[in-house]
Regions:
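Cysteine-centered motifs
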Residues: 2-4, 11
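Serine residues within intrinsically disordered or low-complexity segments
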Residues: 6-8, 18
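Short, Lys/Arg-enriched N-terminal segments with co-localized hydrophobic residues
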Residues: 13-39
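Class II aminoacyl-tRNA synthetase catalytic cores and aaRS-like
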Residues: 35-639
Length: 639
């Protein structure tokens, strides 16, 4: 049979062969097909896909169907060819058998290789062999009557399969292949479902979806903006939005009452495991509301979202916890509540003891706190030393410990500095029992919180205490209004300059006691991850002026950066509040992934570059000239 190409496919013309299978000096057909691998593409003219691969079931037995997709696997058993065809819905098996399948089709099917794009027309039949319970189409197979190779493929640099062990750098370079993997496709389809449900829910709640500008005014406060040079205004730049914050507040001034947007945002900052230079927010703002109103609508949203997407019931109301309580109990403002191991403040217990590390920290205004790792009293010293090195990354000078043996005796790094009664009181305060390991940090509160909070999570990972099938939400409220910057030597806004202080703390703002002022701010935390945050906004001129003054803004500076917003506030501004979710992080947790890169189609790596497109790249000289820009050579970084 001849396989020369035409618009309708291979012509199938019969060619005479000699006994040894050769014709015109050519190798036998089977050998030529194996060598050429059908690199010619055929048209799909006249064909229409009737079903996706994973949609077929026993209910379709006897039907003639047309499927299209990628070859996942081809198994040639010599006269019996099994082809697994894959699309985003799943996999279905096509069976070609000598004597039952036309010889040209059998030969053609035998030549297929992984990732060829194919179209099969055939009849759905019950499987002649064992049922495959691993796939949804495991009861059936397709007996083909027609095959077209729509596109051939080179051998891919890695196998397209679930939970690939290929290095991430390779997968990101060939992201278009990586995205064919079923697990990544499920992630992105879940993300699409989340966005659809989000729009539906908030539309039913009376929210209006409004787009805000991508090209806005750059502001020097906070994270660095991505700058976009203006060709028509030489020397001037737009800033890509870090959030739609100012615009959504203006929309409240405009009377839109309830705003929602799935917004693209940009931040030019050093990347961490849960950060990307461009990301997506579910952004909202509401007028004539307070904290409870924002929390109420968002609890109902989360309950609906998790029920619809994951069939998980979210218990309402969601637990609330003040920032101070979260820090004292968990050493973190985004606590993971799936396990215990809470911090215990033993400052008063060890005050005046003989251990200088403890008493020195207390005398310097710090605290002593500990965690009880239940059942870990037998942990080897080398492992404890590794934990000590771990907390040093968070500013701690060391880690003191008490290992309670099964017989009740203790091994401790500081027992010789304390009396028996002091040690017994400390163990009692920590609720220590035989077999427990007690770990302590002594320093300024922030260092103790940060180090023990991180240690708590690290131990939970090592001890496998984290259940990915459990979803524990908590609202964190009453954040500090300001945080001290050692680098800048001044107070900065913990959230942004437009966050409303707690009414009862306004006198503290007046007196300049900024470290004591609490904000009407709130975060929603899931399994130790902040998935959203927001606040009630300032809508009163006098309080806004005091905020700017506290942050070190002159009136001229405030007007230069935020003049358009302040001007709008002069024409009547309603009390308003809002919240924004990090969509990527939310979906990451729902999909039980470890990185937001696995829920973003084309993510960047840690240096904010794209391995696939090689962005960013130098601009063309002509482009720079049009923009009135000149690039200065940067000094090479030291090795």
């Amino acid at each position: 049979f001849c396989y020369c190409r035409s618009l309708s496919g291979f012509c199938g013309k019969i060619i005479e062969y000699s006994e040894n299978g050769e014709q015109g000096g050519q190798a036998p057909l089977q050998k030529r097909l194996r060598k050429e691998r059908y690199t010619m593409a055929e048209s799909m003219q006249g064909l229409k896909r009737t079903h996706r691969c994973g949609e077929l079931s026993a209910a379709n037995v006897g039907e003639t169907v047309t499927i299209m997709g990628w070859v996942q696997k081809n198994r040639n058993k010599g006269g019996l060819v099994f082809v697994d065809v894959r699309d985003r819905s799943g996999i279905v098996q096509v069976v070609c058998e000598e004597g039952k399948t036309d010889a040209p089709l059998l030969e053609k099917a035998a030549s297929l290789r992984s990732e060829y794009v194919v179209a099969f027309v055939g009849t759905v039949a019950k499987r002649s062999g064992a049922v495959n319970d691993k796939i949804t189409t495991g009861e059936i197979e397709i007996i083909p009557s027609e095959l077209r190779i729509l596109s051939s493929a080179l051998t891919p640099p890695f196998q397209v399969e679930e939970n690939s062990k290929t290095k991430e750098e390779v997968r990101l370079k060939y992201r278009y292949l990586d995205l064919r993997r079923p697990d990544l496709q499920r992630n992105l389809m879940m993300k699409s479902q989340v966005m659809t449900l989000t729009r539906q829910f908030f539309a039913e709640e009376g929210f209006i979806e409004i787009e805000t500008p991508m090209l806005g005014k750059t502001t020097p406060e906070g994270a660095r903006d991505y700058l976009v040079p203006s060709r028509v205004h030489p020397g001037s730049f737009y800033g890509l939005p870090q959030s739609p914050q100012l615009y959504k507040q203006l929309l409240m001034c405009s009377g839109f009452d309830r705003y929602i947007q799935i917004a693209r945002c940009f931040r030019d900052e050093d990347l961490r495991a849960d950060r990307q230079p461009e990301f997506t927010q579910i952004d909202m703002e509401l007028s004539f509301v307070d904290v409870d109103d924002v929390i109420d609508v968002n609890e109902r949203y989360l309950a609906k979202l998790f029920k619809e997407v994951l069939d998980v019931d979210v218990q309402l109301p969601i637990q609330r916890m003040t920032w101070q309580e979260a820090m004292d109990r968990f050493g973190s403002d985004k606590p993971d509540l799936r396990f215990g191991m809470e911090l215990t403040d033993v400052t008063d217990v060890v005050r005046g003891c003989g251990f200088g590390v403890f008493t020195g920290a207390i005398e310097n205004g710090g605290s002593v706190r500990g965690i009880n790792a239940k059942g870990q009293g037998g942990m080897p010293r080398k492992k404890i030393d590794k934990l000590t090195a771990f907390v040093k990354d968070y500013g701690a000078k060391g880690l003191a410990y008490i290992a309670i043996q099964e017989d009740g005796t203790v091994k401790s790094s500081f027992a010789k500095f304390m009396g028996e009664e002091e040690m017994a009181d400390l163990v009692s305060a920590m609720k220590g029992e035989p077999g427990d390991l007690l770990l302590f940090a002594a320093d300024q509160n922030k260092v103790v919180w940060d180090s023990l909070g991180a240690l708590r999570v690290e131990l939970a990972k090592q001890l496998e205490l984290l259940d990915k099938n459990e979803y524990r939400f908590v609202w964190i409220t009453e954040f500090p209004q300001f945080e001290w910057s050692e680098e800048q030597g001044r107070y900065l806004a913990m959230h942004h300059p437009f966050t409303m202080p707690m009414e009862e703390d306004l006198p503290l703002l007046e007196k300049g006691e900024l470290g004591k002022v609490r904000a009407k701010a709130y975060d929603i935390v899931l399994n130790g991850n902040e998935i959203g945050g927001g606040s009630v906004r300032i809508h009163m001129d006098d309080i806004q002026e005091k905020m700017f003054e506290a942050l070190g803004f002159t009136k001229e500076q405030a007007r230069s950066q935020f003049g358009f917003l302040l001007e709008a506030f002069k024409y009547g501004v309603p009390p308003h509040a809002g919240l924004a979710y990090g969509l990527d992080r939310l979906v990451m947790l729902m999909a039980k992934q470890d990185s937001i890169r696995d829920v973003i189609a084309f993510p960047k790596i840690k240096d904010a570059s794209c391995l696939m497109t090689e962005a960013p790249t130098p601009a063309d000289e002509k482009q720079l000239e049009e923009l009135g820009l000149e690039v200065k050579a940067q000094p090479e970084k030291a090795e």
